[in-house]
């Protein structure tokens, strides 16, 4: 057998015909398969929007912001990459047009281009190229780079031109391009139509890129004759035309991709050393996904529920918590405003087994979150609060148990007489409008110390110190901690190691079986194969409540 190449390989994933085809999930599935074949894989997303990062974007437009360990605010696809690869990525995994142009303009202002006329080619493409190539370290066998947007978009052109240049510079044998296209079904004629894919590939060729494989997204099985036609008309091997119909679960996609032979085709074309796919961990996951022993109804009480992608990592973490308990988690999406009154909360939450209060910003919907927390506390329904969810638990305890009826957060009422939640000291200028909003929160991984005998210490398997990712500007006001503990019985069960910042709160188990919250975003570190303990604990409490154990 000839020796295999030791050069880091690049796989680029592009999309055609329509957006939201699942490029990120397909790329993640391919990455998972290559990792399961013994290869070292990292992933990256190129986003063509002009924002520097998604940190200031409307959740209704963009979905969630995924925060990495190093505090970068990134695209939600980075979350898919981490969950499928079971690998922590950093800020370099997300490149935006805004970042690229900001860097190039800053270099021009410093005179680094020595008087050159700064242009898209070569200056912008060189900067993109640098950000792609720096992923290819000695510890990496394969870099998978997803190109955001759709072939034909004006915004994507510099990225696609860069892909062409990378292929030219590192060698065609070291680069593989996967093009994902929609294969629409026309009901009246009963036909799958190949023409949109042909036109999409033609547009890609016009830029100078010939795809090596085509993934067909469709809602049904694809006949061999259709694959042969696309192979002929798009000039790819028939073995490289891959059908990827809609799956019951996103975690079924790797099996589909493998069944079509894409991963085997890729490793052979790129001359990569490989072994057979090790399915041990993934098969156990799929068994838990499709053969649950229990089913629970869980209410996710939020303000952005019209776009579920705004809570993507939360919903995946909740489902993973179900996998840990062999339970199917059926999510009931509840608009927080519907829980403002006791009657509204009872109507929305009376039939659920657990509740999750996720993060958010601004005062809209907060009174409903507080109402949902009160209902959960009074009816002993397991509840997990995340970020703003913790702050709302503190506000509810202050108002209803500690006799501070006007307790509030300075985020919602800057003139409140009882700011039980207040602005972090280093955030005062930003909140006052004297600093940039983007990239200035408390971001990234921070440690916490858990109290002995607490519920959170128990669910974290007895660990005294844990680390979680954060994204917030406000904190529990320490001036009220003693009063809340004494009057409301709320326990501050986890703090920063110096004791100054509240990181976890809970009620004692004899008061409530599982009313727990964290100032962090633990959903960002959950994996389908390694569920996060806080979510697993929530589902466990819900199963016990439902089964009476």
Swiss-Prot record:
Keywords in alphabetical order: ATP-binding, Glutamine amidotransferase, Ligase, Magnesium, Metal-binding, Nucleotide-binding, Pyrimidine biosynthesis
Enzyme class: ligase
SUPFAM superfamilies linked: Class I glutamine amidotransferase-like, P-loop containing nucleoside triphosphate hydrolases
UniProt binding sites for CTP: 19, 153-155, 193-198, 229
Single GO biological process annotation from the record: 'de novo' CTP biosynthetic process
InterPro entries cross-referenced by the UniProt entry: Class_I_gatase-like, CTP_synthase, CTP_synthase_N, GATASE, GATase1_CTP_Synthase, P-loop_NTPase
Record carries keyword Cytoplasm: no
Pathway(s) served: Pyrimidine metabolism; CTP biosynthesis via de novo pathway; CTP from UDP: step 2/2
Residue ranges of every copy of the Glutamine amidotransferase type-1 domain listed in the record: 297-548
Task of the protein: Catalyzes the ATP-dependent amination of UTP to CTP with either L-glutamine or ammonia as the source of nitrogen. Regulates intracellular CTP levels through interactions with the four ribonucleotide triphosphates.
Binding-site list for L-glutamine: 360, 388-391, 411, 473
GO molecular function: ATP binding; CTP synthase activity; glutaminase activity; identical protein binding; metal ion binding
Binding site for Mg(2+): 77, 146
Listed name of the protein: CTP synthase
Binding sites annotated in the UniProt record for ATP: 20-25, 77
Coiled-coil residue spans: none
Subunit record text: Homotetramer.
Entries under Pfam families matching the protein: CTP_synth_N (PF06418), GATase (PF00117)
Active site: 387, 521, 523
Activity regulation information from UniProt: Allosterically activated by GTP, when glutamine is the substrate; GTP has no effect on the reaction when ammonia is the substrate. The allosteric effector GTP functions by stabilizing the protein conformation that binds the tetrahedral intermediate(s) formed during glutamine hydrolysis. Inhibited by the product CTP, via allosteric rather than competitive inhibition.
Reactions catalysed according to its record: UTP + L-glutamine + ATP + H2O = CTP + L-glutamate + ADP + phosphate + 2 H(+); L-glutamine + H2O = L-glutamate + NH4(+); UTP + NH4(+) + ATP = CTP + ADP + phosphate + 2 H(+)
Biological source species: Streptomyces avermitilis (strain ATCC 31267 / DSM 46492 / JCM 5070 / NBRC 14893 / NCIMB 12804 / NRRL 8165 / MA-4680)
Family per record: Belongs to the CTP synthase family.
